[in-house]
UniProtKB/Swiss-Prot annotation:
It comes from Mus musculus. The record marks S354, S355 as: Reactive bond. The keyword Membrane does not apply. This is Serpin B13. PANTHER family: SERINE PROTEASE INHIBITOR, SERPIN, SERPIN B13. One of its GO terms (cellular component) is nuclear speck. GO terms for biological process: negative regulation of keratinocyte apoptotic process.
Length: 389
């Protein structure tokens, strides 16, 4: 992994740890999308606010070294961060006939604030994003509807009413939105006639019915002896993107995996040298995961404080004082079906798939971790915990 990939993976773990504390059920987010959104904020911040943001992304290596650097060196360093993120976005946003991957970022700012043209130019250059002035002071609800309409347009109308009525008001100065949408085709489709209703065990005493898909084929696979867990890599068409599932053997074994997991371990477990092609009898529930987070308290917990305070330094964004981020919303949406694409949910009576003796059984009928990784950039696009249908 390069330095950006390593930093992004560490940031992923920080985010997951905090999101998991406050979410007993499913967790699903895009570390790449959130890192990109923070990059846009860094573009407009200066001083301690910028340094704080860079530290959270593991791109700032200490306050002492920062103090002795010249202003020119600091500018050069900031530009390198944005250049790396720009290259990452360009790589993962390449057009494909086999999947849709849409990462959208937008800033909505109160129109009475004059935003610096240099900032507007840079946010367009590095992030293909724009800052749109809206009238929060006199037309907060109209502005809310405008923002929601933009979100719908970026997510194929799958994400509606991101901001509920009354969530924005005349005191709102800046809203930052990051939306991630993914839709892909499996390299090897599950057969619909093999899908059947099964119990998904939330714990040893409670279960919910799910539509369980089944496929016996060759996948990248490994068994983690010390954790009593299995990892299987499920490729999407053309193998640019794969979903990895980390499944504990025991119904209540997920906590042990999360306790032992680290950025280094995750890279090690899923490296080509650690995985091998095996015949796997894979049982995976149909998934529809949609999660929305106000990331302000989460980011504060991992070390970002001043960016959301009235003392934030956004002088790289506007010459006027008093500007600070008030809302940082993140919504991600994923559907997993037999084809891998969105489809109308339905209950099918299928045929049982018998496990051959040579097949490793990976039966995802209890809580597991999963993530979707882009091969060329070695970036984790999405990370999640599925614990409740």
């Amino acid at each position: 992994m390069d330095s950006l990939g390593t930093a992004a993976t560490q940031f992923l773990f920080d985010l997951f740890k905090e999101l998991n504390k406050t979410n007993d059920g499913n967790v699903f987010f895009s570390p790449v999308g959130i890192s990109t959104a923070i990059g846009m904020i860094i573009l407009g911040t200066r001083g301690a606010t910028a340094s704080e943001l860079q530290k959270v992304l593991y791109t700032e290596q200490g306050t002492e070294s920062s103090r002795i650097k010249s202003e020119e060196e600091e500018i050069e360093k900031r530009e390198e961060i944005h250049h790396q993120l720009q290259m990452l976005l360009t790589e993962i946003s390449k057009f494909s006939n086999d999947y849709d991957l849409i990462i959208s970022n937008r800033l909505f700012g109160e129109k009475t604030y004059l935003f610096l043209q240099k900032y507007i130019d840079y946010v367009e250059k590095y992030y293909h994003a724009s800052l749109e002035p809206v009238d929060f002071v006199n037309a907060a609800d109209e502005s809310r509807k405008k923002i929601n309409s933009w979100v719908e347009s970026q997510t194929n109308v799958k994400v509606k009413d991101l901001f509920p009525e009354g969530s924005l008001n005349s005191s709102t100065k800046l809203v930052l939105i990051n939306t991630v949408y993914f839709k892909g085709l499996w390299d090897r489709e599950f057969k619909k006639e093999h899908t059947k209703e099964e119990d998904f065990w939330l714990n040893k005493n409670l279960s919910k019915p799910v539509q369980m898909m089944a496929l016996c084929s060759s996948f990248n696979f490994t068994f983690l002896e010390d954790l009593q867990a299995k990892i299987v890599g499920i490729p999407y068409k053309n193998n640019d993107i794969s979903m990895f599932v980390l499944l504990p053997n025991d119904i209540d074994g997920l906590e042990k995996i999360m306790d032992k997991m680290s950025p280094e371990k995750l890279v090690e477990w899923t490296s080509p040298g650690h995985l091998e092609q095996r015949r796997v009898d894979l049982r995976l529930p149909r998934l529809q995961v949609e999660e929305t987070y106000d990331l302000e308290p989460v980011l504060e917990a991992v070390g970002i404080h001043s960016a959301f305070s009235e003392h934030a330094d956004y002088s790289g964004m506007s010459a006027r004082s008093g500007l600070h981020a008030q809302n940082f919303l993140h919504r991600s949406f994923l559907v997993v079906t037999e084809e891998g694409v969105e489809a109308t949910a339905g209950t099918g009576v299928g045929l049982k798939v018998s496990s051959a003796a040579s097949c490793e059984l990976v039966h995802c009928n209890h809580p597991f971790l999963f993530f979707i990784r882009h091969r060329e950039s070695d970036s984790i696009l999405f990370f999640g915990k599925f614990s409740s249908p």
